[in-house]
A protein has these predicted regions:
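Non-catalytic C-terminal interaction segments of nucleic acid-processing enzymes
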Residues: 137, 143-189
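Acidic-basic catalytic patches of nuclease active cores, encompassing PD-(D/E)XK
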Residues: 25-70
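Conserved catalytic cores of phosphodiester-cleaving nucleases, focusing on short active-site segments
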Residues: 78-80, 87-101
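Long amphipathic N-terminal alpha/beta scaffold segment
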Residues: 65-83
Length: 189
C-alpha cells in the first residue's frame, strides 16, 4: 500500500524531443544545422518549448547550449560560455523579475530576454523598463502572442525545424507548416 501511495507523488519526468534545427540567418551570415536533444519540463508548454528553440536559432553559434532551464533558478534557458567557462551570453525566456534581470546582467557579458505573452508581457515591460536603463548589456525582444501561439502548434517529439532570418524577420517551418514572426526590439544594446 505504501508503494502505491509513493507512486502517486513521484515527480513527473521530462519529455524528450529530438530536433534537427537548420538555421539560415542572412543577417549574421550563419548557416548551420544543429541536432538537438531537448528535455521539455513537465510544466513547460509547447509554446515555451518552441520559443526556446526559436531563441536558440536566433542566437545560434558553435558553443551555444540549452541549459536545465525551468528546473534550475540560477541558470538561463540558453547560454554561451567561453572556452575558459565565462558567461558570454545569457538568454532568458518569459517575464523574469527585475532582480533576475539585474543578476544575469552582472553574471554575463550579454543578456537577451525573449518576452512573450501579449498584454501580460507589455505590463511586465512597463513595470521593469525604467530599472533596466543602466544595463548596457541587456537586450529585450518581444514576441507577439499570436505568433508564439502559432509556433506552439508546430511542436512534435521529432522535428525537422527550418528557421530563416532576414532583416529582423523570422520564418519557421516544420514540414508544410510555416509561421512568420516579427520580433519587436523593446530594448537594444
Amino acid at each position: 500500500m505504501l508503494f502505491a501511495i509513493l507512486g502517486h507523488i513521484m515527480a513527473q519526468k521530462a519529455t524528450i524531443y529530438k530536433v534537427e534545427l537548420s538555421v539560415s540567418d542572412m543577417d549574421r551570415h550563419y548557416y548551420e544545422t544543429h541536432k538537438l536533444t531537448v528535455a521539455k519540463h513537465p510544466s513547460e508548454t509547447d509554446e515555451r518549448l518552441m520559443v526556446r528553440l526559436l531563441a536558440f536559432a536566433m542566437n545560434a553559434q558553435e558553443r551555444l547550449e540549452m541549459t536545465k532551464g525551468l528546473s534550475t533558478d540560477d541558470e538561463p534557458d540558453i547560454w554561451l560560455k567561453s572556452l575558459s567557462d565565462e558567461l558570454e551570453l545569457w538568454v532568458a525566456l518569459g517575464l523574469p523579475s527585475e532582480k533576475i534581470v539585474r543578476q544575469s546582467c552582472g553574471k554575463s557579458d550579454a543578456v537577451i530576454v525573449y518576452s512573450y505573452g501579449g498584454h501580460t508581457a507589455q505590463m511586465w515591460w512597463e513595470k521593469i523598463k525604467n530599472s533596466t536603463t543602466r544595463f548596457n548589456n541587456l537586450q529585450v525582444v518581444n514576441l507577439l502572442e499570436a505568433e508564439t501561439s502559432a509556433l506552439g502548434q508546430l511542436a512534435s517529439r521529432a522535428m525537422k525545424l527550418q528557421v530563416n532570418i532576414q532583416d529582423g524577420e523570422v520564418m519557421v517551418s516544420v514540414g508544410e507548416s510555416i509561421v512568420y514572426l516579427t520580433p519587436e526590439i523593446w530594448k537594444g544594446v
